[in-house]
Amino acid sequence: MAGFEANFDGLVGMTHHYAGLSVGNKASINNKDSVSNPRKAALQGLMKMKALADEGFIQGVLPPQQRPHIPALRNLGFVGSDEQILHKAAKYSPVLLSKLSSASSMWTANAATVSPSADSADQRVHFTVANLNNKLHRSLEIATTTAALKATFADQNYFVHHQALPQHEDFGDEGAANHNRLGGDYDSPGVQVFVYGRSVFRGGPVPKRYPARQTLEASEAIARLHRLNPAQTVFVQQNPVAIDSGVFHNDVIAVSNRNVLFHHQYAYLNQSQVLTEIRQKMAVLGQNFVSIEVPAEQISIKDAVDSYLFNSQLLSKIDGKMVLVVPEECRQHSAVWDYLQSLSAQTSAPINEVRVFDLRESMRNGGGPACLRLRVVLNDAEFRAVNPATLMNTQLYQRLTKWIEHHYRDELCASDLADPQLLCEVYTALDELTQILNLGSIYEFQR
């Protein structure tokens, strides 16, 4: 196999809590005000990273954000010492404090859109940080995400970092959660599939219940920034019915790897036309497109959302087959589990293995295996240019495990966010983490 896909997972932050901040994300809303366990959440995510690294998959780590975000509270009129600001925010606007304490950066599928060098005109890997302007708590992640990505992929000979698109709803961008790439070998040209929920300038169908967070205009802008060939680019609209059913990002209804697209019957608007366009553009590249479409009569959209069947990772093994990495919730859902057992038993199917991970702490906030990782396709030279301190191995796993066990609380509720001691704990831990991952001073409190 030429080239490879690296997955960079987000470490769960120390303020991981359940506040129901994400309208359209059913798990987030349904678990509002539950007591969280940040330590368990971080260890669950870390265990997945280590397990996949042990199986030979390239696995990296991206850091959490500094939260509660005191600079934002200051910008919004709260004055005094950090302790005074936390007290005032908790007293006068506890919802705002919760939003500015969110650990949602763990879901690095929303960190950026990434295009490999094989698809870009300048033959470099392109990153565009997502503006995430549909949700206040996520829109504040841009600066630190940019700094973390630049510290991880620093060599300008190989990597290009674009600033986020304008902070306006016309260019709403949710990153790689609405982006797939299909192709053959990872270091060969492929077809990039941008998925949007609505078009600002062209109109058309839109969801009625929940917001369409990604616009066509944002996706087109990213394709231009990444210098992609229009003949190898596809823009498709997510089915509004799916969005209204709780599919807030495309990675809740579809996942791709190499030439395979694993998706629901109702993932896209005009789905047969979408699949035909992808197939034709891949054929020009001499590649055979494989669509694994899950019928609604077997798995309903509700079943898909409840189990997060499609919010999975589809990874290529050494033998050429693929493994589907799913959350424990898939095993607990009888119809979904029966389908997966049948799928992996088909000798002619590209997917012949299913791996299950317990990610319950993240799942209760609406984030499965696919949400937790940012895919970065690299060739050998580009891989050698990646910050090695961020790549998962036994030593890093052991260091991060000790770091989490030392710094993270095992219980957190909304009222704890006003505790000034928690803020001190966060700053101490993150300062240490930047040394472990060799990131430099990426946080505002470090400058």
From Swiss-Prot:
Coiled-coil ranges from the UniProt annotation: none
Binding site for substrate: 19-28, 110, 137-138, 213, 251, 365
Pfam families: AstB (PF04996)
Similarity field: Belongs to the succinylarginine dihydrolase family.
PANTHER family reported in the protein's UniProt record: N-SUCCINYLARGININE DIHYDROLASE (PTHR30420:SF2)
Keywords: Arginine metabolism, Hydrolase
Enzyme Commission code: 3.5.3.23
Enzyme class: hydrolase
Biochemical pathway: Amino-acid degradation; L-arginine degradation via AST pathway; L-glutamate and succinate from L-arginine: step 2/5
An example Gene Ontology biological process: arginine catabolic process to glutamate
Subunit-level organization: Homodimer.
Transmembrane segments: none
UniProt-annotated catalytic positions: E174, H249, C371 (nucleophile)
Record protein name field: N-succinylarginine dihydrolase
MF terms in GO: N-succinylarginine dihydrolase activity
Function: Catalyzes the hydrolysis of N(2)-succinylarginine into N(2)-succinylornithine, ammonia and CO(2).
